[in-house]
Amino acid sequence: MARIAGIDLPRDKRIVIGLTYIYGIGNTTAEKVLAEAGVSEDVRVRDLSPEDEDKVRAAVDKLNLTLEGDLRREVSLNIKGLQEIASYRGIRHRRGLPVRGQHTKNNARTRKGPARAIAGKKK
């Protein structure tokens, strides 16, 4: 099992998909990493040679990406900063409501959580 940036990549997937299991690497970045490393996107993780693994690790380091714990910390600090300055976005985060302008009259159940029954309200 290949271990890159502290994450075990799934053995049965193609390397381009396996890299997306690392927080902070999506499809486009995974393709850039593999192009930098000179490794084919179609190779399965289990078929990677140790040299190819080292090339991919070096390419991830060379691209100077913020990944995993550092990226999660950065995002949470950004949200915390928005809350501290009491911006509109920070208030929406604090209240657990949609941040990006979605309507909340009918939907937004993902952000608001399960519906709560209101006493005395009938159809």
Curated annotation (Swiss-Prot):
Keywords: Ribonucleoprotein, Ribosomal protein, RNA-binding, rRNA-binding, tRNA-binding
Region (Disordered): 94-123
A single GO cellular-component term on record: cytosol
PROSITE patterns, alphabetized: RIBOSOMAL_S13_1 (PS00646), RIBOSOMAL_S13_2 (PS50159)
Keyword Flavoprotein annotated: no
Keyword Nucleotide-binding: no
Gene3D superfamilies: 1.10.8.50, 30s ribosomal protein s13, domain 2 (4.10.910.10)
Subunit structure, interactors included: Part of the 30S ribosomal subunit. Forms a loose heterodimer with protein S19. Forms two bridges to the 50S subunit in the 70S ribosome.
Full protein name: Small ribosomal subunit protein uS13
Source organism of the structure: Oenococcus oeni (strain ATCC BAA-331 / PSU-1)
Taxonomy of the source species: Bacteria, Bacillati, Bacillota, Bacilli, Lactobacillales
